[in-house]
Curated annotation (Swiss-Prot):
Keywords: Early protein. Plays a role in virus cell tropism, and may be required for efficient virus replication in macrophages. Belongs to the asfivirus MGF 505 family. This is Protein MGF 505-3R. It comes from African swine fever virus (isolate Warthog/Namibia/Wart80/1980) (ASFV). It comes from the Viruses. Induction: Expressed in the early phase of the viral replicative cycle. Pfam families: DUF249.
């Protein structure tokens, strides 16, 4: 069959119901047969049928690339599959010629990283950009919840205080709470209180509460009184009129009287009303 006729069939037939008399041999001639999987048919923009079973086109592309099946990869890309999945699949199975063939359609490895679950593949993907540093890898590991990457480089990070602090604050801003706990607990950071600044600025009550869980445990284990620290942050959130943060600080031991005094001074009526209702 001529290549032009095959291309025409590949473009037109997938949107139609395939005739029953199309056996594997005919489908192979048409380029619509996937070895070890079966017939291929495009049914929607993002969906195909593989041996009459529906599958997302990008998932199919990832599998085809992991098998090193250039023909099927090309077919699925012509059906508007996302080339990032071709790179991921090829990386997982170490088809590096295929990786470099399709990476050019993506250009930035950082656009691929969110699709990857395996830490080894994640690091390989990041290495596709030869200009990126380890610090860049660590930042994207935090943003994509790839804790095993940080665990692998624990000894390296343990000697790099600046980077640990930067990653800690990034995890706080991106609401990666598991990362926040791990970085502080394993690597240690010089300025834990930066967490509270970020939490208050971003109105992130969960991070704010997590910060107290972390820092109070440290203070109590050292036999230190946390009252000064609690009231320091209580003043900050009271001045800003952040009632949920005020209540959370009081819950951990902050002074209700300080909150009421500052609410009166800065005329935060919603805070005063809350405490009036509470007391009544």
């Amino acid at each position: 069959m001529s290549s032009s006729l095959q291309e025409l069939c590949r473009k037109k037939l997938p949107d139609c119901i395939l005739p029953e008399f199309f056996d594997d041999y005919v489908l192979q001639l048409l380029g619509l047969h996937w070895q070890d999987h079966g017939s291929l048919q495009r049914i929607e923009k993002n969906q195909i049928l593989v041996q009459q079973e529906p599958i997302h086109i990008n998932e199919a592309l990832k599998v085809a690339a992991s098998e090193g099946n250039y023909e099927i990869v090309e077919l699925l890309l012509s059906w508007e599959a996302d080339p990032r999945y071709a790179v991921v699949g090829a990386l997982e199975s170490k088809y590096y010629d295929l990786v470099h063939k399709y990476y050019g359609q993506v250009k930035d490895c950082h656009d691929i990283l969110p699709l990857i679950q395996n830490p080894e593949t994640f690091e390989k993907c990041h290495e596709l950009n030869s200009t990126c540093s380890l610090k860049c890898l660590f930042k994207h590991a935090v943003m994509n919840d790839m804790l095993p990457i940080l665990e692998k480089y624990t000894d390296y990070l343990d000697r790099w205080e600046y980077c640990s602090q930067m990653l800690f604050e990034l995890a706080c801003r991106k609401k990666k709470y598991e990362m926040v706990v791990w970085i502080e607990g394993v690597l240690g950071v010089g300025k834990v209180t930066s967490l509270f600044t970020i939490a208050i600025s971003n109105r992130d009550l969960q991070l704010y509460s997590l910060g107290f869980s972390i820092i109070l445990e440290k203070l109590y284990s050292c036999g230190q009184d946390p009252t000064f620290l609690l009231n320091h942050f209580l003043r900050d959130v009271s001045i800003k009129g952040l009632l949920p943060f005020v209540l959370k600080t009081i819950e951990y031991g902050g002074s209700k009287e300080i909150a009421i005094t500052l609410a009166k001074k800065y005329q935060h009526k919603h805070i005063l009303k809350y405490f009036e209702t509470w007391e009544s």
